[in-house]
Amino acid sequence: MANETNRQFEKVLAVCRELFSKKLYDYGASWRIMRPQSLTDQIFIKAKRIRTLETGAENLVGEDINSELIGIVNYGLISLIQLDMGYADNCDITPDKAMELYDAKAQVTLELMKKKNHDYNEAWRGMRTTSYTDLILTKIWRTKQIEELGGETKVSEGVDANYMDM
């Protein structure tokens, strides 16, 4: 079963990558301007919208939960890039470089997910889908707290680990 899950992880990541690539064509690396806190808030907005839709609110925008989840994955990977590079005052990297950075962060995150899937023995499969949303929101609040602490923690993993978990 773990091999099937790994294939599913890879398939979903390919969908996320394709959308990232298309948006990169449309907008360039405009996200380079965003500070880490702003990226955390973008992920928060998407997770909050998912929770709102899960609780039965009318969908006036028309985008479904899957599109918001793709956004969370992509903003999470962008956040990891920004943690390494810092933010910029303009779009200072080429689309090719942006894709290279995206692929590198995606690969590291994918490998972590595979390891966690193994160690947790596919526990995700027994979870309610709404629990994923709650976990993402929890990770966002943890990230915000760590950001407020200037990145310093006493025992917890850092912001990067939370972005990878989202």
Predicted stretch roles:
Residues M1-D165:
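Intrinsically disordered, low-complexity regulatory regions
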